[in-house]
Amino acid sequence: MPAHSLAMSSPALPAFLLCSTLLVIKMYVVAIITGQVRLRKKAFANPEDALRHGGPQYCRSDPDVERCLRAHRNDMETIYPFLFLGFVYSFLGPNPFVAWMHFLVFLLGRVVHTVAYLGKLRAPIRSVTYTLAQLPCASMALQILWEAARHL
């Protein structure tokens, strides 16, 4: 599909696609970081991986690996709903600037949240960025519900 077709189907769609793709890449980066931390700390989840990297004693948990896994799980709990909400919201005909702000606030909130989580930054940075990123999701969800209810 040519790029101009994306904009014609919904002026907000290109912004959504850009932010969504960046968020998916960010999730891949967290997964890669998790793997690197496992290797550095010699803390493997599977016995066969531990055997390959030194022996069965390395099939163990590690606080830093667990932190990475929690960050990744938190991404899944927030980014997957955003992908649905943002896609549907894009087709409601929102003001393109307002849509951009929804998508950008979520993206920046999630990036800072990940940096705060993995970097062990002091409270309340992580919880503030988590909440900030949830505001556009709540806004989009309410607008979707409103539009759906209007057409019942």
Swiss-Prot record:
Q: Which cofactor does it need?
A: glutathione
One biological process term in Gene Ontology: prostaglandin biosynthetic process
Name the predominant localization: membrane
Q: Which residues lie on this side of the membrane: Lumenal?
A: 1-12, 91-95
Q: Which UniProt keywords apply?
A: Cytoplasm, Fatty acid biosynthesis, Fatty acid metabolism, Isomerase, Lipid biosynthesis, Lipid metabolism, Membrane, Oxidoreductase, Prostaglandin biosynthesis, Prostaglandin metabolism, Transferase, Transmembrane, Transmembrane helix
- The membrane spanning regions, by residue number, are 13-41, 61-90, 96-119, 124-152
Report the superkingdom from the record.
Eukaryota
Binding residue positions for glutathione: 38, 73-77, 113, 117, 126-130
Question: What Enzyme Commission number(s) appear in the record?
Answer: 5.3.99.3, 1.11.1.-, 2.5.1.18
Quote the catalytic activity from the record. Answer: prostaglandin H2 = prostaglandin E2; 2-glyceryl-prostaglandin H2 = 2-glyceryl-prostaglandin E2; prostaglandin G2 = (15S)-15-hydroperoxy-prostaglandin E2; 1-chloro-2,4-dinitrobenzene + glutathione = 2,4-dinitrophenyl-S-glutathione + chloride + H(+)
Instruction: Spell out the residues of the site Essential for protaglandin-E synthase activity.
Output: 49, 126
Name of the protein: Prostaglandin E synthase
Q: Which organism is it from?
A: Macaca fascicularis (Crab-eating macaque)
